[in-house]
């Protein structure tokens, strides 16, 4: 159920919740089912657009301040590869970015979980502006609906890899996953939650997911970005509070609770963490997990002078991991020409 602070917002509620809510408003459960259809299938943005509802009831809801909870598009950038970045505004005046990443076979939506981010990873633009607040469930779901509306395609995949640290907003993220799965028909196995790691939260995520979702079939992607603690602290300031071994232990705990393997992410920074010796060290760390490692070539941001690795360095790093029996892939940098790639999202319109 939505929080008290958002009790007049309908987006994020499931079919049975909308039925109960309609009855509580003196209407039939059928009106709740109509609302569900218009919120999720038809993508209504305003209650006054739902003309199948009685006009008097719509007016009454408007007087009470009841809203759907959609976000307002403030800017749009379309890259040469058709990746689309949206700057969206919230009801309280905050802004966030979300990205639609299309291929012939799928449409992936990269959603934000917070306005800004407190983790301050040196290679990421989002953390440069700090954290304003966490997003509500409806604000996460609304991002997917905005991308669907703009790109005129049904999203097939959702990745929590936009602005913010999802594990600092666990309850809203899990409620959003429930809504995306049940109400928008996006399978859990097509949803990925990415985290840089927050102490003591992975076991809690596992337990809450089992409790709220009945199962935890979404993919958990843990961002390592370094093969050892000292280099990780250099790149991720908050890592000093979360020793590497403790993070990996929590990954094992997550696997034990959910039965789902953890995948790992590693951003390659030219001349800093992309040496074959780093790959060997990383293989030592993650080899026992039988997990997948996703390599990401650094995407430039204005505030830092990190270098994108050469193709030879990337392939060399990959070959070392593969020679050690580690499953590995390289993520394509989509939307790079419009600052829509991994690590480039911000809270405000960019010139």
From Swiss-Prot:
Gene that this sequence comes from: rlmN
Cited Gene3D superfamilies: 1.10.150.530, Aldolase class I
GO annotation, biological process: rRNA base methylation; tRNA methylation
InterPro entries according to UniProt: Aldolase_TIM (IPR013785), Methyltransferase_A (IPR040072), RlmN_N (IPR048641), RNA_MTrfase_RlmN (IPR027492), rRNA_lsu_MTrfase_RlmN/Cfr (IPR004383), rSAM (IPR007197)
Disulfide bonds: 110-342
Domain of life: Bacteria
Enzyme class: transferase
Function: Specifically methylates position 2 of adenine 2503 in 23S rRNA and position 2 of adenine 37 in tRNAs.
Enzyme Commission code(s) on record: 2.1.1.192
Protein name: Probable dual-specificity RNA methyltransferase RlmN
GO molecular function terms listed in the Swiss-Prot or TrEMBL record: 4 iron, 4 sulfur cluster binding; metal ion binding; rRNA (adenine(2503)-C2-)-methyltransferase activity; rRNA binding; tRNA (adenine(37)-C2)-methyltransferase activity; tRNA binding
Catalytic residue positions: 97 (proton acceptor), 342 (s-methylcysteine intermediate)
């Amino acid at each position: 159920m939505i929080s008290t602070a958002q009790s007049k917002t309908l987006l994020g509620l499931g079919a049975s919740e909308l039925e109960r809510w309609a009855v509580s408003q003196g209407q039939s459960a059928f009106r709740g089912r109509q609302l569900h259809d218009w919120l999720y299938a038809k993508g209504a943005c305003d209650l006054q657009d739902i003309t199948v509802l009685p006009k008097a009831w719509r007016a009454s809801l408007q007087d009470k301040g009841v809203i759907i909870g959609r976000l307002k598009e403030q800017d749009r950038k379309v890259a040469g590869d058709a990746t689309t970045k949206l700057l969206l505004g919230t009801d309280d005046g905050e802004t966030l970015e979300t990205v639609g990443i299309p291929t012939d076979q799928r449409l992936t939506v990269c959603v934000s979980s917070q306005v800004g981010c407190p983790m301050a990873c040196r290679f990421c633009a989002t953390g440069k502006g700090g954290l304003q607040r966490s997003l509500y469930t409806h604000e996460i779901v609304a991002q997917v609906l905005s991308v669907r509306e703009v790109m005129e395609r049904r999203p097939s995949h959702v990745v929590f890899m936009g602005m913010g640290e999802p594990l600092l907003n666990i309850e809203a993220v899990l409620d959003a996953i429930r809504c995306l799965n049940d109400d928008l028909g996006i399978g859990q196995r097509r949803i990925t939650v990415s985290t840089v790691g927050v102490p003591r939260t992975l076991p809690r995520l596992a337990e809450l997911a089992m409790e709220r979702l009945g199962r935890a079939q979404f993919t958990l992607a843990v961002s390592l970005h370094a093969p050892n603690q000292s280099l990780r602290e250099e790149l991720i300031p908050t890592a000093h509070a979360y020793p590497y071994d403790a993070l990996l232990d929590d990954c094992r705990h997550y696997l034990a609770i959910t039965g789902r393997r953890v995948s790992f992410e590693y951003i390659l920074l030219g001349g800093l963490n992309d040496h074959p010796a780093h790959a060997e060290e990383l293989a030592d760390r993650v080899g026992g997990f039988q997990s997948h490692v996703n390599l990401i070539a650094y995407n430039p941001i204005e505030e830092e002078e990190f270098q994108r690795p050469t193709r030879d360095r990337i392939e060399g790093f990959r070959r070392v991991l593969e020679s050690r029996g580690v499953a590995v892939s390289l993520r394509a940098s989509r939307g790079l020409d419009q600052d829509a790639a991994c690590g480039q999202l911000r809270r405000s319109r960019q010139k």
